[in-house]
Amino acid sequence: MPLPRKHSPPNGIQKAICIVDDDEAVADSLQALLETFGFNVQSYSSGSEFLADERHRAAGCLLIDQHMPGTSGLDVVDSLREEGVQSPIILISGRLDASTRERATRLGIRELLDKPVAACRLIQAIRTTLANIR
């Protein structure tokens, strides 16, 4: 499917969207898609790499994979919440069981998306998430 023509982010939002996913192919395709829609995107290959970068505090929205070696997506979110970071989070995973969903809800995660996620569903989730923080 061809990528849509270049779009602008909703309401002129320019804060970065951070992708945290250990699968380089997934991260690269998500980044390409989001950049096509005019978003500023930063990718990280692990939760520890993301948490070590001070820019994580200023992210507009976080797309975090749940199942990564070392630190899971929900563990990353736990660390963020302990730091007082309240950036909106979209958790993406190929396996979202009931306990993961419950924990994600307790941590204030706004969207839970199953992999593979359709491009239109992801863009809709990001736009909704960003609109809710204005």
How does the language model describe each region?
Residues S43-C61:
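Acidic, metal-coordinating helix/loop segments flanking the phosphotransfer/catalytic sites
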Residues E54-R57, S79-Q86, L107:
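Conserved phosphotransfer cores of two-component systems
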Residues D75, L96-E111:
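Alpha4 helix (beta4-alpha4-beta5 surface) of REC/receiver domains from two-component response regulators
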Residues K115:
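A Lys-centered signature of the CheY-like receiver
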